[in-house]
Amino acid sequence: MASFMRSLFSDHSRYVESFRRFLNNSTEHQCMQEFMDKKLPGIIARIGETKAEIKILSIGGGAGEIDLQILSKVQAQYPGICINNEVVEPNAEQIVKYKELVAKTSNMENIKFAWHKETSSEYQKRVVEEDEEPPKWDFIHMIQMLYYVKDIPATLKFFHGLLAANAKILIILVSGTSGWEKLWKKYGFRLPRDDLCQYVTSSDLAQILDDLGIKYECYDLLSTMDITDCFIDGNENGDLLWDFLTETCNFIKTAPLDLKEEIMKDLQEPEFSVKKEGKVLFNNNLSFIVVEANV
């Protein structure tokens, strides 16, 4: 690995912009919307049974777009029931955006919001240190955030222990069938790493849950990321997408020529992408893992 390559996470503003470009060029949120519309109602069908209040914990809620979709489904399932929605999110900018989104969204009257600017591990530490009994939750969701957890088995075990009767955890992350799995396995050791992020897919998560003896169901949904601009020399959008794909700041400018050529060639191969109507569509398949409370 060339010493002048550095992690994308070392430049916060560039990371935020590259992530925005990823969302704009992928079907990520549409894929999540499809799951929320078709699968989520059945998953949450019993979480609020006989309860005067439904408690929801969002780990890594970001700017709240998907959180509000989830809340609308819970409201539809349990009309009039008070919902207590707590958000654990380490990024202050994202919390501001989340609050702005709530402020301009209608039908939020029966939902109480609380935001905690902290990581999931900081939340765990705070809960453990408090003398009172840890709170129980009816629904916990972790959307595209397990990559930023150092000890995934311990994290899953902890939050599984916070589930109330009939409660569920929803975890969303990239599928083991996605191009990400192949990209990380083949090139991860040649790209700059830092402690903030690790490579994990649904295949890894299934093994962890099996080892912990935790019951779960997994749903895979198709998603793509349009990386056509990545193959246009000097294209700003393409350069930012390269940064997101490789988690490398200014990948095109700083990566060794041989590495760039190899990845560029591979990402156009069928195991990574499909070519359709002149576009190169990277396999961004997502997995939705639903974890159940102990009976």
Curated annotation (Swiss-Prot):
GO BP annotations listed: histamine catabolic process; histamine metabolic process; hyperosmotic response; methylation; response to amine; response to cocaine; response to glucocorticoid; response to immobilization stress
Chain positions recorded as S-adenosyl-L-methionine binding sites: G60, E89, Q94, S120, I143
Electron transport among keywords: no
Residues modified as Blocked amino end (Ala): A2
EC number: 2.1.1.8
Molecular function via GO: histamine N-methyltransferase activity; N-methyltransferase activity; selenol Se-methyltransferase activity
Residues that hold substrate according to the record: E28, N284
Name of the protein: Histamine N-methyltransferase
GO cellular component: cytoplasm; cytosol
Role, per record: Inactivates histamine by N-methylation. Plays an important role in degrading histamine and in regulating the airway response to histamine.
Gene: Hnmt
InterPro entries the record matches: HHMT-like, SAM-dependent_MTases_sf
Catalytic function, reaction form: histamine + S-adenosyl-L-methionine = N(tau)-methylhistamine + S-adenosyl-L-homocysteine + H(+)
Cellular compartments annotated: Cytoplasm
Short name of one Pfam family: Methyltransf_23
Keywords: Cytoplasm, Methyltransferase, S-adenosyl-L-methionine, Transferase
Family membership: Belongs to the class I-like SAM-binding methyltransferase superfamily. HNMT family.
Assembly mode: Monomer.
